[in-house]
Design a protein with these regions (language model features):
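Structured core elements
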Residues: 2, 46, 96, 177, ...
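Short, glycine-/Ser/Thr-/acidic-enriched flexible segments
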Residues: 8, 52, 65-67, 87-89, ...
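C-terminal segments that line or cap access tunnels to active or ligand-binding sites in enzymes
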Residues: 44-50, 58, 63-70, 77-144
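A conserved FAD-binding loop/helix module that cradles the flavin
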Residues: 211-231
Length: 249
C-alpha cells in the first residue's frame, strides 16, 4: 500500500530531480551517509493479520518512497509504501521443463493468491495497515492512501487489489522438496540426496518442504552447514570402509 504524506521528506521528493540525485550522491561520497547508505526498507515488523492467528503470519517492509512498479520513476509527491507479505501462503506453484534444451529457461508458475486462505490474509493485511496508518501518531503527516485507494473495501475488492499492485518478495522455496522415504512428493531423501541419482545432493532453499515464517537467508545457511556435515560424515565412512578393506585384503 502507498500513502501520500505532508510535513515529511521522502525519497520521492529528494531524488526526483538531477539536483536531488547529485546531492544524495555527494553526501554519500563525502560522508558515507544519507539515502545511499540506507537499506530500501527503513522499518520491518511482524504481525498477525487477524486475532485468530496464534503467531505472526505477515511481515511488513516500509519504505520512504513510492512508485507504480519496480523500474518505474518515483512519484513526484512525498509518500511512503507499506509492503506486507504473507509468511505462510497456502498457494502452490510449479516449475516445469520447457523443452529438451537445457539452456532454455523453465516455465515458472507462482499461483499467487490462488487459494481462499491467501486472499483472506491479503484482505485482512490491507485492513490492518489502514488501522496502523490511522493511528494518532501518524496524523501529523496527514497520510492519504492512493494505492490501492480507499474505494476498495470488501474482501474480494481488497484481494483483487493485492493481486494488481502486489509483487514477489524474492523468497522462492520448495521446488526440490526433502522428505521421508514414504513421501512420494519428496525429490530428496533426508540426507539431501536426489532419489535415484548417485553422488548428487541439492543444498539451497528449494529443499524446504514449507517456507519459514520470515526471511529464509539464515535457515538456508543452516541447511548448508548441516549438508556440509552430512557430506563430511559420508566421506569419512567411505574412507574408513576403504581402509578396512585394504587391511583385510
Amino acid at each position: 500500500m502507498a500513502f501520500k504524506v505532508r510535513n515529511a521528506k521522502t525519497l520521492n521528493t529528494m531524488a526526483n530531480s538531477w539536483l536531488g540525485k547529485m546531492q544524495i550522491a555527494l553526501e554519500y561520497a563525502l560522508n558515507r551517509s544519507g539515502p545511499m547508505s540506507m537499506a530500501p526498507s527503513q522499518l520491518g515488523a511482524f504481525a498477525r493479520s487477524d486475532a485468530a492467528q496464534t503467531s505472526a503470519n505477515i511481515q511488513y517492509h516500509v519504505q520512504p518512497l513510492s512508485l507504480n512498479k519496480f523500474g518505474e520513476p518515483l512519484h513526484p509527491f512525498p509518500a511512503f509504501t507499506a509492503s506486507v507479505c504473507n509468511l505462510r501462503p497456502t498457494a502452490r506453484g510449479h516449475v516445469r521443463i520447457a523443452s529438451s534444451d537445457a539452456a532454455q529457461a523453465p516455465k515458472i508458475t507462482s499461483n499467487y493468491l490462488s487459494t481462499e486462505e491467501d486472499r483472506q490474509v491479503a484482505a485482512d493485511a490491507l485492513r490492518l495497515t489502514r488501522r496502523i496508518v490511522a493511528a494518532p501518531a501518524m496524523q501529523r503527516y496527514e497520510p492519504e492512501e492512493f494505492l490501492p485507494g480507499p474505494t476498495f473495501q470488501t474482501d474480494a475488492e481488497l484481494a483483487h487489489a493485492a493481486g494488481n499492485i502486489g509483487t514477489t518478495i524474492f523468497h522462492p522455496v520448495g521446488t526440490c522438496k526433502m522428505g521421508r522415504d514414504d513421501d512420494a512428493t519428496a525429490v530428496l531423501d533426508p540426507q539431501l540426496r536426489v532419489r535415484g541419482v548417485v553422488g548428487l545432493r541439492v543444498v539451497d532453499g528449494s529443499v524446504m518442504p514449507l517456507i519459514t515464517s520470515g526471511n529464509p537467508n539464515s535457515p538456508i545457511i543452516m541447511i548448508a552447514d548441516k549438508a556440509a556435515g552430512l557430506i563430511l560424515a559420508d566421506r569419512k565412512r567411505a574412507v574408513g570402509s576403504g581402509a578396512a578393506g585394504s587391511a583385510n585384503a
